[in-house]
From Swiss-Prot:
Subunit description: Part of the 50S ribosomal subunit; part of the 5S rRNA/L5/L18/L25 subcomplex. Contacts the 5S rRNA. Binds to the 5S rRNA independently of L5 and L18.
PANTHER family per the UniProt record, alphabetical: RIBOSOMAL PROTEIN L25/GLN-TRNA SYNTHETASE, ANTI-CODON-BINDING DOMAIN-CONTAINING PROTEIN (PTHR33284), RIBOSOMAL PROTEIN L25_GLN-TRNA SYNTHETASE, ANTI-CODON-BINDING DOMAIN-CONTAINING PROTEIN (PTHR33284:SF1)
SUPFAM superfamilies xref list: Ribosomal protein L25-like
Name of the protein in its database record: Large ribosomal subunit protein bL25
UniProt family annotation: Belongs to the bacterial ribosomal protein bL25 family.
One of the GO biological process terms: translation
UniProt GO molecular function: 5S rRNA binding; structural constituent of ribosome
A single Gene Ontology CC term: cytosolic large ribosomal subunit
Amino acid sequence: MANFSLKAVKREDLGSGASRRLRRAGKIPAVIYGGDKEAVSIVLDHDKVLHSTEDKAFFSSEITLEIDGQEERVIIKALQRHPYKVKLVHADFMRV
């Protein structure tokens, strides 16, 4: 089983306008939910996530997200793609 790890930053600005600005800057808005903790909005680097999705194991493996120095073990639950561009739009992760 492959090990996947991605770096993320907590999101302060929420909403569609903020998400649009992130996408233009080469980032992906995402959310982590599940477990006994509150949902957390995060930002990921688009190119690193896109590169990880080229490996089919990414969708069924445990992923380690490093968020501001803390590690979260998650699995990917949803990944939204642009209808015709090779772009990711949003990701949902669930805590393991």
